[in-house]
């Protein structure tokens, strides 16, 4: 029988090869190293990414009422955009002088191809666009546009510092955009700086000046001309020449004309105000009792008092698609801390009002901790039921399976998120089944002592081969239908449908390679030890208990 098994069974040939060589040890080391690398390199997110391409079409119709915009532009545009392959919904808003049409594609559609299809459809039907339409614009909307970091700048200075906060925020965001994998970013709150000119009609009339004269004078005195470049030290410097304004004082010093040999400046006929632009929104930050627990960046000044309110400017930072939210957030905060005290004054308080990178990292680390506790629990239970050596053999399958599964996640573009780790926790109780059956049957054959240790191991593995393979693929097939879930739940549950079958398949491979190798190395010394008689199934305690229950 043994000779036939050795000659005919492919499984036995594989088991013999991995048991008698160093391939299993090599497989063990490579899988653990690859898993450690994948754990560090795979992007971390709080939830799986759901790709739902949405295109916003902005249409300008100057002078048209909301009803005219709806009849002439919005309704025909909705009909046209619904004809695009892959479009699921079309929404629209009509306002006086403008319309916004949102085109939502099916979940999983490619963002770039959806953008191209939308633009091509509009370009191919320009003859249907009413002459009253002055301009249209297509802008894609994606999940990565949601900011992962919000930095709020506030100051205890009086209200006049609101514009200064915006100026600091604009300079800071220009530096933060240099961080790798920083995507869309913008500033919210605090009106931007604007130099306003308020001409005095009486003085203009006395000087025989008009508003176009002022516009022409400003245009002539604010010119930047490109005159060439200079290359030195591997840098190319752009040379510009011409008069230009650096501050409000220079704007006021603009010469309008000469009257009686005396120069007439802009400040003589107009009021120049270096202040804020027209404000259509106000942003403030209030500090409550938990002010001492809030996260700040590089703050050395006393914290605000509970109940205090301040003007605020907020910097919103989003990440690029597929990048690691944790590393992007850490780099943004690190650079911000370096700039505190130089670009950012000491009296400006930087508060981290959102940090999805830290949130994702905390939740992933928390699940990893629970996963480690689950692995430890299984090892203890196996040690109590099978024995220490047997539990050690079975426990090898857990880190190896998870390591290679994480590597597959990295290679196939999946991220480490809550659903991914939940899939690993779910598969934990399933993936040890094959090694347990393997070790238990090898242990039984070593007790029977009918064959030499190596041959007994091969016979034991071959005996449980059909049910092990069948049971593993039965579990795999039960998770395959999750690949066909439609809608937003499809990509959300995709890590579950991917990770559990991969983990089960790897546990089967390990049961036929590493588990026999470890069993042969660790259990061979116990072959026949402590057993004076051949193992008798009917005399075992378990057999008698089951027999009594069935009777």
Annotate each language-model stretch with its function.
Residues 2-375, 416, 491:
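Membrane-proximal extracytoplasmic
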Residues 380-385, 402-419, 469-520:
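Hydrophobic, glycine/alanine-rich multi-pass transmembrane helices and their short helix-loop junctions
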Residues 37-41, 376-444, 484, 502:
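Hydrophobic transmembrane alpha-helices and their membrane-interface caps
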Residues 23-28, 365-377, 397, 401, ...:
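Hydrophobic alpha-helical transmembrane segments of multipass membrane transporters and ion channels
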Residues 44, 48, 67, 386, ...:
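Short helix-terminus and kink motifs of transmembrane alpha helices
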Residues 1-26, 448-449, 454, 458, ...:
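Interfacial helix-loop-helix hairpins and adjacent transmembrane helices
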């Amino acid at each position: 029988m043994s000779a036939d098994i050795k000659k005919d069974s492919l499984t036995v040939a594989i088991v013999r090869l991995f048991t008698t060589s160093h391939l299993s040890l090599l497989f063990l080391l490579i899988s653990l190293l690859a898993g450690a690398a994948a754990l560090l390199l795979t992007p971390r997110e709080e939830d799986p990414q759901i790709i739902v391409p949405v295109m916003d079409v902005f249409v300008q119709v100057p002078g048209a009422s909301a009803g005219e915009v709806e009849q002439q532009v919005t309704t025909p545009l909705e009909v046209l955009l619904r004809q695009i392959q892959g479009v699921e919904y079309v929404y629209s808003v009509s306002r006086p002088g403008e319309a916004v049409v949102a085109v939502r594609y099916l979940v999983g559609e490619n963002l770039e191809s959806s953008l191209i299809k939308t633009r091509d459809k509009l370009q191919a039907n320009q003859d249907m666009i009413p002459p009253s339409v002055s301009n249209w614009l297509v802008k894609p909307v994606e999940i990565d546009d949601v900011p992962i970091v919000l930095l709020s700048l506030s100051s205890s200075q009086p209200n006049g510092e609101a514009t200064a906060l915006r100026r600091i925020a604009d300079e800071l965001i220009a530096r933060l955009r240099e961080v790798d994998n920083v995507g869309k970013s913008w500033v919210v709150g605090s009106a931007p700086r604007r130099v306003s000119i308020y001409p005095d009609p009486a003085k203009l009339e006395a000087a025989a000046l008009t508003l176009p004269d002022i516009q022409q004078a400003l245009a002539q005195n604010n010119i930047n001309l490109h005159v060439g470049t200079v290359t030195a030290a591997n840098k190319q410097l752009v040379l510009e020449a011409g008069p230009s304004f650096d501050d409000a004082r220079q704007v006021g010093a603009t010469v309008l004309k000469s009257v009686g040999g005396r120069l007439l400046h802009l400040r003589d006929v107009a009021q120049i105000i270096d202040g804020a632009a027209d404000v259509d929104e106000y942003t403030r930050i209030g500090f409550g009792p938990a002010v001492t627990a809030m996260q700040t960046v590089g703050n050395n000044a006393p914290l605000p008092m509970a109940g205090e309110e301040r003007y605020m400017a907020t910097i919103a930072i989003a990440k690029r698609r597929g990048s690691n939210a944790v590393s992007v957030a850490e780099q943004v905060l690190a650079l911000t801390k370096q700039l505190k005290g130089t670009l950012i004054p000491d009296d400006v308080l930087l508060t981290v009002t959102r940090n999805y990178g830290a949130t994702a990292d905390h939740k992933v680390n928390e699940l990893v901790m629970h996963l480690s506790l689950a692995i430890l629990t299984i090892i203890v239970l196996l040690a109590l039921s099978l024995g220490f050596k047997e539990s050690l053999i079975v426990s090898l399958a857990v880190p190896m399976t998870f390591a290679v599964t994480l590597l597959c996640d990295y290679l196939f573009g999946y991220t480490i998120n809550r659903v991914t780790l939940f899939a690993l926790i779910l598969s934990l109780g399933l993936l040890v089944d094959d090694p347990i059956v393997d070790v238990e049957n090898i242990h039984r054959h070593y007790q029977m002592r009918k064959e030499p240790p190596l041959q007994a191991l091969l016979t034991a593995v071959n005996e449980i081969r059909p049910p092990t393979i069948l049971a593993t693929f039965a579990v795999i097939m039960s998770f395959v239908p999750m690949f066909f879930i439609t809608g937003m739940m499809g990509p959300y549950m995709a890590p579950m449908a991917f990770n559990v079958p991969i983990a089960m398949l790897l546990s089967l491979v390990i049961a036929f390679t590493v588990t026999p190798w470890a069993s042969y190395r660790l259990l061979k010394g116990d072959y026949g030890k402590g057993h004076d008689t051949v193992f008798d199934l009917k005399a075992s305690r378990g057999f008698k208990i089951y027999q009594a229950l069935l009777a």
